[in-house]
Structure formats: structure tokens, C-alpha cells
Amino acid sequence: MSHRYEIKLAAQMAEASYSGRSNASLAAAWRDGLDQHDVQAIFLKGDILLIPGSNSVMDYLKFNLRVLNIGGTRYRLSDEHTEKGASGTVWHQGFLHHAKVIYDWLERQRYKPKFIIGHSLGAAATQILVRTYGVPGIAFAAPRPRRSRGAIKHSELCLCVNRDDDMVCDLPGTFHHMGRVHRARAARSVFGPDHSMKHYRKVIDEQQTGGHLHRHWPS
């Protein structure tokens, strides 16, 4: 039976992930954390995996030109290099290597997540790790990590919640999301960092109040 999680609570946790253990709610639930180059992840009691990304992305250009330093290798997110994951799925190479650092850490620590929550770069990793572990996940402000489109195994377990005014969610342009994508139209567009979790929490409230978004995932 799949673990079920409140979408609003998941958004709160995603925002809190940028504060780490200084956030009281995370500190109480904290089991372990990873902070290695450009890769961060938090493993919480209840076997919840939390993956922050970029809460301060201001625009399309800054995100598209971002360079990740992973294991001494540099990956530019605007590159279209791909690589097959262990499942045989073809992913964006930079996103895949980011997710693999988290996977290797989980394996070393013998942690197995029951639910995965990620934002931004962490939302790309969420999609990949949902495919790996076969557990539900919510990806906020999700870029596109997958080369091809269409359903694959476990894709029904992944929910991508994207604001329709967040250009990061359309990157890289020739790639695709995994799972169900909920494009949320905000009552009012934000000038500046509409990519941040603060603005995602607001649009989730609006969408749920209007009956456009379920309260839980899986719904």
C-alpha cells in the first residue's frame, strides 16, 4: 500500500528544507542529512526523503545556465546530454548524476524512502527517484528530466506541481516530465521569484480552495 501525504504539508516541508535543522519542525523529525557539493538531501523520521534545490532562482536564464559540480565533474543544465539510468530510462545527464549522489547516500546508510518531496533541482531528482524506488513523490517547480514522453513504470506515483508562470518548469525545452503534471494558474502572477516555495504554497492554497487540486497525494 502506498504512503499518502498532504500536498499542503509537503509544500511546507519543501520550503522548510532550505533552513535545514534550524527549522523547528524539521529538527524534530530529522534523521540524517546529505550536503555534498551541489547536492543536498534530508531523511526524516517516517522515511520521508526531502530534496531542496534552488529557492532563489530569479529567472529563466540563471537556471538554464546553472552549472552543477558533482563528483568533480561539471554539468550545465542547458546541455542536452543524456544517460540511461539503472532502469533503462533515458534522463538528462546532469539531473541523473544529481539523483545518483542521493541514491548512493541512501544505499550506504541503508535508508529506503516511503515518500519523496523535492523542489526545483530537487524536483528533477524526485521524478528520477520515484522511478527508482517505486514510492510516491511530489515534485514542486519541476524541471523536465526525461528524454522521451509517455507513461513508464511508477510514473503514476509522481505528481509534479508547477506554476504556469514559472519558466523553469519548461526546462530543458526538449525534455519531458515524469508522472502527472498539475499546472497551477496563480490568481496573480509574481514579479520576480515566482519559482520559490513561498509562492508555490500560495498557489496551492488557491488551487485547493477552488477545488482544482486534491488535498493528498496519491489522491
Locations of regions flagged by a protein language model:
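A conserved cap/lid and substrate-binding interface adjacent to the catalytic center
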Residues: 20-117, 143, 150-152
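N-terminal low-complexity, Ser/Thr- and acidic-residue-enriched intrinsically disordered segments
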Residues: 1-32
